[in-house]
UniProtKB/Swiss-Prot annotation:
GO terms for molecular function: importin-alpha family protein binding; metal ion binding; small GTPase binding. It comes from Hendra virus (isolate Horse/Autralia/Hendra/1994). GO terms for cellular component: host cell; host cell cytoplasm. Plays an essential role in the inhibition of host immune response. Prevents the establishment of cellular antiviral state by blocking interferon-alpha/beta (IFN-alpha/beta) production and signaling pathway. Interacts with host IFIH1/MDA5 and DHX58/LGP2 to inhibit the transduction pathway involved in the activation of IFN-beta promoter, thus protecting the virus against cell antiviral state. Blocks the type I interferon signaling pathway by interacting with host STAT1 and STAT2 and thereby inhibiting their phosphorylation and subsequent nuclear translocation. Interacts with host IFIH1/MDA5, DHX58/LGP2, STAT1 and STAT2. The keyword Cell inner membrane does not apply. Keywords: Host cytoplasm, Host-virus interaction, Inhibition of host innate immune response by virus, Inhibition of host interferon signaling pathway by virus, Inhibition of host MDA5 by virus, Inhibition of host RLR pathway by virus, Inhibition of host STAT1 by virus, Inhibition of host STAT2 by virus, Interferon antiviral system evasion, Metal-binding, Phosphoprotein, Viral immunoevasion, Zinc. The gene is P/V/C. Pfam families: Paramyxo_PNT, Soyouz_module, zf-Paramyx-P. Disulfide bonds: none annotated. Residues 296-317 have a biased composition (Basic and acidic residues). One of its GO terms (biological process) is response to leptomycin B. This is Non-structural protein V.
Amino acid sequence: MDKLDLVNDGLDIIDFIQKNQKEIQKTYGRSSIQQPSTKDRTRAWEDFLQSTSGEHEQAEGGMPKNDGGTEGRNVEDLSSVTSSDGTIGQRVSNTRAWAEDPDDIQLDPMVTDVVYHDHGGECTGHGPSSSPERGWSYHMSGTHDGNVRAVPDTKVLPNAPKTTVPEEVREIDLIGLEDKFASAGLNPAAVPFVPKNQSTPTEEPPVIPEYYYGSGRRGDLSKSPPRGNVNLDSIKIYTSDDEDENQLEYEDEFAKSSSEVVIDTTPEDNDSINQEEVVGDPSDQGLEHPFPLGKFPEKEETPDVRRKDSLMQDSCKRGGVPKRLPMLSEEFECSGSDDPIIQELEREGSHPGGSLRLREPPQSSGNSRNQPDRQLKTGDAASPGGVQRPGTPMPKSRIMPIKKGHRREVSICWDGRRAWVEEWCNPVCSRITPQPRKQECYCGECPTECSQCCHEE
């Protein structure tokens, strides 16, 4: 069935619908003409393929079944000798080429055409390589060893020898190849799949700031972060073209900030560190306190207060000395008022007057320096000066035992051009937030102050 027949059938269907439009039952805008069932369409396709190819029988599973012999084949369609001297002539192919009729279906996976360029080198597009300039085309022969025979065009190459192939050999070769590919269902022109070599080592991932500080790192956590000095250039990220100008600008900005990041060091680095930076309890080192217990002088809070974390305290106990790295800023204090929620509470009067910064409370003994008080009033006496601090429960008249503490959180922030570390404290009952934000107590049992932050100074 060619294109003209298909077009005529379509026109006949349109005429039938137009003539019987009034008789067709209307079902809410949908046509009552139903499509044939899948079984009917499958049977119609089987009949079409059998009538077109004439050499395959459809099996029950839908796969073509080859008879394996030459009785059901039309030998004249496969090959024919047109010249009297025995040379190869033009053979009629049972394969429909896409170049001639792109709408037809290619029935066989094997192209068996050998075409002379009788019209001045115009190529029909058959074969794996066709070149009108050369005047000859390749032909995939039916030999079982996979040889390729090049049939020259005698008109373009008159001195080429004439090749004679017995008709029986050609029939056996073509039938053998067609049986082989038809039974296997393979495409001879397909390119074999070559998998990639998975054993080739890939490039190492780029260094990210989370690797050094242990926050936000996914994957293998068994490897400890590197100790000692950290290359700060690896976490400087500049997206502007003026890198030199931006670098000078942010170096000046970091120089103004005295907040520093504390990382762990090994005892071997102790010789190159000033002893004035040794942080720890004087009682642990055999020294006496410069002031009596409970009589600490009030210190004036300055912006260059140095915060230390548990990593620093652990390094002191192991014999290491903390080392400070400049040019990384911790911008949020433990109870800072930069959060918009806290500022809104202050405007509403929930936190009247008073400073939001933490002060060091009196200490009863040196051994209980890092331990929170187990009996605190959550009323006016819960905070120094009778000031209600953000993130604390509402005042109550009874004494409530403290069952929960605080959680120290660290976040590495990045504004597109630089990265810095922010650290803050939240009650244990509050949610863990990806951004630095002071959360309020939900259970009413958390302390009003973080004992770790209060006893650091």
